[in-house]
A protein has these predicted regions:
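Short, active-site-adjacent cap segments at secondary-structure transitions
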Residues: 28-32, 82, 306
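Conserved catalytic cores of soluble enzyme domains
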Residues: 49-56, 60-77, 81-208
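A structural preference for short, pocket-lining loop segments at secondary-structure junctions
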Residues: 3-46, 65-76, 98-101
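C-terminal alpha-helix plus adjacent terminal tail
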Residues: 141-144, 159-347
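Charged catalytic carboxylate motif
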Residues: 4, 58, 254, 258
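Hydrophobic alpha-helical membrane-association signature
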Residues: 1-5, 55, 278
């Protein structure tokens, strides 16, 4: 599917009469729930890491292609958007959330890291360190939260999507541009509500905690803030912080430490540089035990009891984390063509 989509996008980008691209999921359940990580891990378990890495090579090249397309791309995030689904939506010009949207980057709980350009879009689209919070905890955003968090450019009720498609198609081969597509989307927008329980109501607290330089520092800040918020009036914030602590406790210690460094480095890199960095990381994760163990525990045996190795944050050294970011042998680095176009958003 990745190769087919990449081929189609490349052809449309080169076709003068194609003035816009709309991406949507098949059916109402999901936009894209991510790649088949069970199949990838099965390849890695046989020792064929090169074949497993090839999946990620093609996926990241697709992400880069979306990032440099000048043809306006509208991704309709109607339903589940996880992992790879973020990679084929976040790098385009427009991202439309609906009341049925559910977005997450749950990779740390799988023993991986938020890839597909997550090191680029999480620090840029989200306010402050909210992207770090999402990447480390895998927290799920729903509906209008995607727009409020900066991950969606527009919020349009699902009932209005058929009319939106007609409007976009009606722009014709010469009437579509970034500005006219944006105007069309705005014509269907509605203002939603952020639920009272949303962590978006506690950005200052999350920014303070997830701005720490280490994962241990994040945990310490969360605990200290929880203890300081003892009043009934602060119950909502305390629940958000406690949920974050629980999520961190479930993640792979290696994944958590690599992810924190990855997102910090990604703030200063282009999309292409981020994807090349992530390709180095995924090569190492395919050879390390935690990715396969996370897939076993959460997706295969489904016992929910991954045995991480190392099993604690204290056992994951700075040197071991840095090794994940080291250059690959000659000829194995991710090759990408061209530079990403400048988006109308913060990308």
């Amino acid at each position: 599917m990745i190769a087919g989509l990449a081929d189609a996008l490349a052809r449309w980008e080169a076709a003068p009469l194609v003035q816009g691209v709309l991406l949507k999921g098949a059916g109402e359940k999901a936009f894209c729930a991510g790649g088949d990580v069970k199949a990838v891990v099965a390849q890695a378990r046989t020792g064929d890491v090169a074949a497993a890495a090839e999946f990620f090579r093609q996926e990241y090249q697709l992400n880069a292609l979306l990032g440099r397309m000048r043809t306006p791309v509208v991704a309709v995030l109607d339903g589940i958007v996880m992992g790879g689904g973020c990679g084929i939506s976040m790098h385009g010009a427009f991202r439309v959330a609906t009341e049925r949207s559910l977005l997450a980057m749950p990779e740390c709980a799988l023993g991986l890291f938020p890839d597909v350009g997550g090191s680029h879009f999480l620090p840029r689209l989200c306010p402050g360190h909210f992207g770090t919070f999402l990447g480390l905890t895998g927290h799920r955003l729903k509906g209008f939260e995607l727009k409020a968090a900066g991950l969606a450019t527009h919020f349009i009720p699902s009932s209005r999507l058929p009319a939106l498609e007609e409007r976009l198609a009606g722009l014709g081969p010469t009437g579509a541009s970034v500005d006219t597509v944006d105007a069309a989307l705005q014509g269907f927008e509605e203002v939603g509500e952020v639920p009272a329980s949303s962590p978006l109501h506690h950005l200052a607290a999350l920014d303070e905690c997830f701005g720490a330089a280490t994962v241990e520092g994040v945990q310490d800040a969360l605990r200290a803030r929880c203890e300081a918020q003892a009043s009934a009036a602060a119950a909502g914030e305390r629940e958000v912080l406690q949920a974050a602590l629980k999520a961190l406790a479930k993640g792979s210690p290696t994944s958590l430490k690599v992810t924190l460094q990855q997102l910090a480095m990604g703030r200063l890199k282009s999309l292409e540089e981020c994807l090349q960095m992530e390709f180095r990381l995924v090569h190492r994760f395919l050879r390390a035990p935690d990715f396969a163990e996370g897939v076993r525990a959460l997706l295969e045996d489904k016992d929910g009891e991954p045995q991480w190795n190392p099993g604690s944050l204290s056992a994951v050294t700075k040197a071991s984390v840095d090794a994940y970011f080291a250059p690959l042998p000659e000829g194995e680095e991710l090759a990408l063509g061209g530079k990403a176009r400048r988006s109308r958003g913060k990308l």
